[in-house]
From Swiss-Prot:
Upregulation: Not under feedback regulation. Regulated by phytochrome. Induced by red light pulse and reaches its maximum level after 12 hours. Transcriptionally regulated by LEAFY COTYLEDON2 and FUSCA3. Not regulated by cold treatment or auxin. Up-regulated by paclobutrazol.
Active site: 292
EC class: oxidoreductase
Protein known as: Gibberellin 3-beta-dioxygenase 2
Disruption phenotype: No visible phenotype; probably due to redundancy with GA3OX1. Ga3ox1 and ga3ox2 double mutant has a severe defect in seed germination and root growth, and a dwarf phenotype.
GO molecular function: gibberellin 3-beta-dioxygenase activity; metal ion binding
UniProt source species: Arabidopsis thaliana
Amino acid sequence: MSSTLSDVFRSHPIHIPLSNPPDFKSLPDSYTWTPKDDLLFSASASDETLPLIDLSDIHVATLVGHACTTWGAFQITNHGVPSRLLDDIEFLTGSLFRLPVQRKLKAARSENGVSGYGVARIASFFNKKMWSEGFTVIGSPLHDFRKLWPSHHLKYCEIIEEYEEHMQKLAAKLMWFALGSLGVEEKDIQWAGPNSDFQGTQAVIQLNHYPKCPEPDRAMGLAAHTDSTLMTILYQNNTAGLQVFRDDVGWVTAPPVPGSLVVNVGDLLHILTNGIFPSVLHRARVNHVRSRFSMAYLWGPPSDIMISPLPKLVDPLQSPLYPSLTWKQYLATKATHFNQSLSIIRN
């Protein structure tokens, strides 16, 4: 019997008890970061910009492939997701996080739970707290949304359902653009399904809120990490904060281009391409002027499918860089080794 995504995450719980929200007018010591807390905290910033790709460009596959190879991240326009839907998901996210704390806590993630309100799963790997709050959706949000909005939760559930539908189609399209640039064909990935549309894949929607911060240079919204996914698609409101790291230039900010989405390569796509596409380290910084919201679609394979480097992308004279493993197995490694996981499993 195959595992649902909820089962996968539940089998590797990372529970961080919810503490009282910080006083948003001052920065407590528990929220004050230094390079001792994260070696890359003060790494240099760069004026470089992420590639911005118009998905209607006739050379889109080449552009996506090049961005995946050189950056592991890029921004996209003309992606086909209705602007009305992006407005709706942003409105939902803002409405959720503006609820009174006690109301949000009614939908708090349980100790062995996956969905609901809480802090980032990566928080357990750091000594300092992050200046953010989140809400995780896996499957139907009906149970949790009913607690938050007793009288009008159904319209919010419909927004999530429509958002997921559009994101899944977009993720599949981007996947084929990226892999197609490497010469990968539909027959090379059996688990893409009979129509090669990746209908059996699974995903998490992560809603994030980064309140304005009195001392943003000493705080961290979401610490540096890679995603345990094939691909992540993020929509951010009109406030900058997302940064990606490249060894040769340092931290690069992804500016909020109206209507655009940010895409980043995850650990599993790095494995699938035998290391050709880097799984990019990224983080979220905060500011003292305005709150920031982001909505991430974390897309992965069917949870029990074996993921391994595609034979077409492995030098016949060398062994694959990574072994075969399921998403479930990889998450078990990530739950223990965090950002060292790819190094740990490498052949």
